Amino acid sequence: MNNYIKIWDVILNELSKIYSDEVFKETFSNIKKIKQIEEKIIISVETEFIKNKIYKMYFEKIKEINKLKFEEKIIIEFVSENNKKNCNFDNEKKHFENIKKELKNETEIFFCKIENNDEFKNNKHFRKNEIKQIENGYNDNINVEIENRKISFNKYNYGNTNPKYSFDNFVVGKSNNFAFKISKKIAEEKKVTTNPLYIFGKSGIGKTHLIQAIGNHILKNTHSSKKVLYVKADGFIEEFTNQLRKAKMEDFNEKYRDIDLLLVDDIQIMAGATRTQMEFFKLFDYLYLNQKQIVITSDKQASELKNIMSRLTSRFEAGLMVDIQSPDFNHRLNILKKKILEFEPQNTLKIKKDVLDLIASSFVNNVREMEGALLRLLNYAQTFGYDIDINIANEALELLIKSKKSVSYDEDVLEKIKLVVSNFFNISVRDLMSKKRQQKYTFPRHIAIYLIKELKDIPYNIVGSFFKRNHSAVFKAYQKIKKNSQSDYELKKSLELILKKINS
């Protein structure tokens, strides 16, 4: 017996040289007892989770050390304390009733051996399909090992993605096409080939939609039995902190490690949360080593994350990083049209183009804000019984648009555009910005408006505020130059020369 204890001590000593103190203590400090049965060492650990972890992550190394250090053939086996205990039906029923009180959705319960199968079958506590499963798989009056039994609860809230997010209702454009295609590819693949997927971009441009669409697609179309978990980073921090305080880390680990797809939104929120980052690092490595898919979103690329451990950011960078840019004007129009169809599926709601142009040009960098503005307008018109036109749109969205005007733009670039255009047409900046209606002033003014829109994608109403013109006048000026530049060679040449000077 002592010899076998010494053998295990030698193996432990070698493992401590290979793995960090943190990993070693977490996994191998939970050894309960060691016993010998002939040429076999049986090592008891506290939980089934720890046993499985050792087999998945460390057992090959243990066998390798065993072979190198000892000549005689020694078999090492791990068992968990809670799996060794046989429990009778009454105990199991009490356990089941306790779980029922605690949980509201679906969960998994691990049953011990049931000694009397007839008692099991005759008890109304179990459903018919469970009885049928026993009858089909086993004879009466034998021990039955039942694992991973599904009952009508879900302890860990797997499959918690919002069903409204799908690939079908995601509006694809140049700014998000690559991120969309990669996300769909990952959702459709049976094997993990891209891990992790790291999607970054400004707030409100579709990152959350995409990662939840991945989860929903997997749940609905491909692998419905897979466990999918969506969590925002702040929710992960709160949950980890609470479970740590309550000494329930085993539940926490069981929840997050027994999944097939982890979706983490806004990872940048973990900045400065050192303990949480350490826990997430361990979780990340566990899922990665076990070929479980990880998808992460952030408002910036991994190399720009502040106060996030470098060993985490390096793992993010080792995967596939894809960005989503702000949508261009036409893309924003398409998003608005899609949103209108969601609001009125019968397509009876007609909104004029100038109204959509106003919204699309006023909310440039945040799709969520733009959609919110549209919904405000639709509800405003519906509540008061108005037909939607440009006047009603301005009335309904006045405060929202005014707040957007406070956004700062690169004044140096705007000033340079005005100066270059004025010099090119040999007029003063003052005349360019004036309300003079002569052709020698209006044409250069229209050119300046067009270039500001093209180069900076600033909303029409804000461009109008620069020139003291309304939205409609600015829109017409832009469209006129854009249309004429396609057929007027001289105009096209002038625009190219002006652009060259601006960029020099």
Curated annotation (Swiss-Prot):
Gene Ontology molecular function: ATP binding; ATP hydrolysis activity; DNA replication origin binding; lipid binding
Keyword rRNA processing among record annotations: no
A single cellular component GO annotation: plasma membrane
Domain III, AAA+ region: region residues: 160-381
GO biological process: DNA replication initiation; regulation of DNA replication
Signal peptide: none
SUPFAM superfamilies on file: P-loop containing nucleoside triphosphate hydrolases, TrpR-like
InterPro entries the UniProt entry points to: AAA+_ATPase, Chromosome_initiator_DnaA, Chromosome_initiator_DnaA-like, DnaA_C, DnaA_dom, DnaA_N_dom, DnaA_N_sf, P-loop_NTPase
Binding-site residues for ATP, renumbered to this chain: 204, 206-208
Keywords of this entry: ATP-binding, Cytoplasm, DNA replication, DNA-binding, Lipid-binding, Nucleotide-binding
Region annotation (Domain II) ranges: 80-159
Region described as Domain IV, binds dsDNA: spans on this chain: 382-504
Compartments where located: Cytoplasm
Major subcellular location class: cytoplasm
Region entry Domain I, interacts with DnaA modulators, spans: 1-80
Domain of life: Bacteria
Complex formation: Oligomerizes as a right-handed, spiral filament on DNA at oriC.
Function summary: Plays an essential role in the initiation and regulation of chromosomal replication. ATP-DnaA binds to the origin of replication (oriC) to initiate formation of the DNA replication initiation complex once per cell cycle. Binds the DnaA box (a 9 base pair repeat at the origin) and separates the double-stranded (ds)DNA. Forms a right-handed helical filament on oriC DNA; dsDNA binds to the exterior of the filament while single-stranded (ss)DNA is stabiized in the filament's interior.
Sequence similarity: Belongs to the DnaA family.
Domain notes: Domain I is involved in oligomerization and binding regulators, domain II is flexibile and of varying length in different bacteria, domain III forms the AAA+ region, while domain IV binds dsDNA.
Name of the protein in its database record: Chromosomal replication initiator protein DnaA
Organism: Aster yellows witches'-broom phytoplasma (strain AYWB)
